[in-house]
Design a protein with these regions (language model features):
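Helix-rich, well-folded core regions that mediate interactions or catalysis
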Residues: 1-175
Length: 175
């Protein structure tokens, strides 16, 4: 029942999000930063200039698949997209929220700069429609693929360096 659905969500739709390393989450967050550079450059620039920890805030959004951040109806629509499209739907939703509500961040004084305004009051239909915008769809898919490829390359590099240090290679011991 419900537990099987949760296990499937964690294992298949969000691989690496809920394990001890959270590597899948870190890859998605790297992609998210790149997606925002493409889809909301002014907002991304302000976040960087203000030193706003997007990674820290997005952790809750992505791990909890927006259950604690969006109105329930919007969350359920995002989940529909997640089940259909996979984790890229979470990046598209976040990019859509920044696109729709980025003006609130751009106009906010730095002393009250709060990322929660991005998701507050999101209209369910509007956030889903915006997340399906071709520019957002392409940016999210491209940046997630790039981040995943970089992660695989880095993991291979680290594994190879570890094998060299221990004196082993793929074919066994060297020497």
């Amino acid at each position: 029942g419900a537990f099987a659905l949760l296990a499937s969500l964690c294992d298949h739709l969000l691989p690496g999000f809920h394990d001890t390393t959270m590597e899948g989450l870190h890859v998605a967050q790297a992609a998210l930063a790149s997606v925002l550079q493409v889809t909301a450059p002014a907002v991304h620039q302000k976040l960087s200039a203000e030193g706003v920890p997007l990674k820290e805030q997005s952790t809750s959004w992505l791990l909890c698949v927006f259950i604690d951040a969006l109105p329930l109806e919007a969350t359920l629509r995002v989940w529909d997209l997640l089940f259909h499209d996979g984790q890229v739907a979470l990046l598209r939703t976040t990019a859509a929220a920044f696109h729709l509500n980025g003006h609130s961040l751009l106009n906010a004084p730095s002393e009250i700069f709060d990322l929660r305004v991005v998701l507050e009051g999101c209209d369910p239909g509007e956030i889903v429609a915006t997340s399906l915008d071709p520019i957002i769809q392409e940016a999210a898919a491209d940046e997630l693929a790039k981040a995943q490829q970089l992660h695989v390359q880095e993991a291979s590099r680290v594994k190879y360096q570890g094998a060299e240090r221990s004196g082993t290679r793929a074919g066994g011991r060297t020497g």
